[in-house]
Amino acid sequence: MEKVLVFGHKNPDTDAICSAIAYAELKKELGMNAEPVRLGEISGETQFALDYFKVEGPRFVETVANEVDNVILVDHNERQQSANDIESVRVLEVIDHHRIANFETSDPIYYRCEPVGCTATILNKMYKENGVTIRKEVAGLMLSAIISDSLLFKSPTCTEQDVAAARELAEIAGVDADKYGLEMLKAGADLSGKTMEQLISLDAKEFQMGNAKVEIAQVNAVDTNDVLVHQAELEKVISAVVEEKGLDLFLFVVTDILTNDSVGLAIGKAANIVEKAYNVSLENNTATLKGVVSRKKQIVPVLTEAFQA
């Protein structure tokens, strides 16, 4: 049986990794030869979850057409966020919870996108719909994905469906969602030992906003100053990325997991759009974004609207 690769976006977060594992397992149970893979490094937060539930991380691939003809995308759909050679393979399915942009296919496909906080929430439904029992370890990873994407249920993207799914999965996994979740988020917020290049690419996504090319990277911290003390070095590596990719804006967002506020570091010729979008003034290229924790709901649509205004 021909193999199908299942993967999330480049610079994968916990949902991208864990949902690839969970969906590949469901597809295998349903008779498909599916393998989860990843398009980037595993973050400290994700590694904590993998270690906790004793699951091996997916192998890394840069290209997919050299291995398979067919792929399944989870937690993304935009071409620039996917495998470098995504145009050379057939996308069989997409399971996602983001905006749909820069995506088209030559054939009809199974496309499931729901306005929930996490791909794993959708997968929880799909396991039930197919009558497949979720293994304890996989339930733990799916729970981890929901906790990560919802910032332990505090993000505005978090829905009642996400909370209900997390409670169900926590029971299967045999953990206390709140206690485990805080441990996992703290592990992810430990940025010691990371280079500046790693910091700005840990969870970075590229977007087309009108005619502008924008990259938004986000890291969680217990104290934003722990990251911003390195601002000069960060600006140097961000400026290099802006030049290399021809970006109009690179927004580096440091989110405080305790206060649920963020600080944005804006570099690029369109940095003023951040001021316009949030009605703030950049001082030394930074501004506090009160109550902003979600890239998907509080940053991407707000900046997109500002660019198009």
From Swiss-Prot:
Main location: cytoplasm
Reaction catalyzed: diphosphate + H2O = 2 phosphate + H(+)
InterPro entries given in the database record: DDH_dom, DHH_sf, DHHA2, DHHA2_dom_sf, Mn-dep_inorganic_PyrPase
GO-annotated cellular components: cytoplasm
Cofactor names: Mn(2+)
Keyword Metal-binding carried by entry: yes
Cofactor note: Binds 2 manganese ions per subunit.
Keyword terms, alphabetized: Cytoplasm, Hydrolase, Manganese, Metal-binding
Family note: Belongs to the PPase class C family.
Protein name from the UniProt record: Probable manganese-dependent inorganic pyrophosphatase
Gene: ppaC
